UniProtKB/Swiss-Prot annotation:
<dbReference type="InterPro" id="IPR000552">
    <property type="entry name" value="Ribosomal_eL44"/>
</dbReference>
<keyword id="KW-0687">Ribonucleoprotein</keyword>
<dbReference type="GO" id="GO:1990904">
    <property type="term" value="C:ribonucleoprotein complex"/>
</dbReference>
<dbReference type="GO" id="GO:0046898">
    <property type="term" value="P:response to cycloheximide"/>
</dbReference>
<dbReference type="GO" id="GO:0046677">
    <property type="term" value="P:response to antibiotic"/>
</dbReference>
<dbReference type="GO" id="GO:0005840">
    <property type="term" value="C:ribosome"/>
</dbReference>
<dbReference type="GO" id="GO:0003735">
    <property type="term" value="F:structural constituent of ribosome"/>
</dbReference>
<dbReference type="GO" id="GO:0006412">
    <property type="term" value="P:translation"/>
</dbReference>
<keyword id="KW-0196">Cycloheximide resistance</keyword>
<comment type="similarity">
    <text>Belongs to the eukaryotic ribosomal protein eL42 family.</text>
</comment>
<dbReference type="Pfam" id="PF00935">
    <property type="entry name" value="Ribosomal_L44"/>
</dbReference>
<protein>
    <recommendedName>
        <fullName>Large ribosomal subunit protein eL42</fullName>
    </recommendedName>
</protein>
<keyword id="KW-0046">Antibiotic resistance</keyword>
<dbReference type="InterPro" id="IPR011332">
    <property type="entry name" value="Ribosomal_zn-bd"/>
</dbReference>
<dbReference type="InterPro" id="IPR053708">
    <property type="entry name" value="Ribosomal_LSU_eL42"/>
</dbReference>
<keyword id="KW-0689">Ribosomal protein</keyword>
């Protein structure tokens, strides 16, 4: 379990700042895939009609976790940047700090 604070003081390379400022931290989430990307258009065209599945469906998944990506937004100039972290199974934004001798809770 990785516990990350909701704010972080880090360098902002936006035009207005170019100094260390407080950034708001959120977790990156992938957007919805576009129906009009070239690969998707080609795939849909190939799939239409008779003939079943035309491309292989991938089954041999190797990884059990994804890398955590943080989205940092400057509170002064609203510039956003992304910061990749190491792999982990659980992430918590702004959770309580660990106490000595306490058990972990999920």
């Amino acid at each position: 379990m990785v516990n990350i604070p909701k704010t972080r003081n880090t360098y902002c390379k936006g035009k207005g700042c170019r100094k260390h400022t407080i950034h708001k931290v959120t977790q990156y989430k992938a957007g919805r895939a576009s129906l009009f990307a070239q690969g998707k258009r080609r795939y849909d065209r190939k799939q239409s009609g008779y003939g079943g599945q035309t491309k292989q469906v991938f089954h041999k998944k190797a990884k059990t976790t994804k890398k955590i990506v943080l989205k940092l937004e400057c509170t002064v100039c609203k510039t956003k940047k992304q910061l990749p972290l190491k792999r982990c199974k659980h992430i918590e934004l702004g959770g309580e700090k660990k106490q000595k001798g306490q058990a972990l809770q999920f």
